[in-house]
Amino acid sequence: MSHLLIQASTPLCLLQDAGRFGVRHLGVTQGGAADWLSMAWANWLLGNAPDAAVIEVTLGGLSVVAKADCTLALAGADLAATIDGQPLKPWRSFALKQGQTLAFTLPLSGARAYLAAPAGFVAPQVLGSCSTVAREQLGGPDGFGRGLVAGDELTYTGHAGQLRELSYELQPVFSANPALDVVLGAQMGAFSGQSTFDAFNSAWTLDTRADRMGIRLLGPALVYQGAPMISEGIPLGAIQVPPDGQPIVLLNDRQTIGGYPRLGALTPLALARLAQCLPGEGVHMRPITQDGAQREHVAFMQRLKSPSPRGRGD
């Protein structure tokens, strides 16, 4: 069993996996990695299951020390990672020798990086997951929902093989003003015609009021003209429109029910793109059919099963 010592951390450095399923009828949210795609690639680089437990590093501020020679993998945002001061780019596995320090400083591209270990980090399973949800006091290194703090030791039991790097053409690009695909919801027809036009033809800015529960989008006020709603279950990526007309995209740590009307829901791949956007950046929404969203998702999952890695001898 190998160990990593947390030397420094922030409240935004969390243990995550795919999240909790089959428990929302109990009022327990899903949790899980905000950018599931980058988590899956980080795990793939080590031959792990796609949902093996990883460290989600948001905006930087994490440093870890290897207690023994090890092989780890990094995917997602470029948070200016270094090993003993030497730059380390994402989308690759790498060796970390005993006593060396891996540090994440500040976002150069994207917002969230994912650090994987062979077979995944070991942590208590709470309702089938180790994902950290602070509000519900679930998951994390001790099972009670806290983030990583200095002095924590994380363990893993797997063994890595050859160092690998994800082919450039498969690496997600965290571009400016990304397109977010939306599967339209049941209340879409109850918005005004102007609001329907504005939703998909306007630039939206990410508000600073953003966390793992949701992200508010700033732009033209959308007007709902339908009858008041009874609260209902909320899927991951739902786009709620409160009375002020500014949409809120609900994320992994969202509440389980809500009564605001919804434009629809982001596709899983759109959610991964949104998770890498910073407050103040722009996005735009575009409608997609459920059929089209499913085809896009299946195509990605096929690439995940049989990508073209580059072996590395360094």
Residue ranges and their predicted role:
Residues M1-R310:
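Conserved "landmark" site that anchors the functional core of diverse proteins
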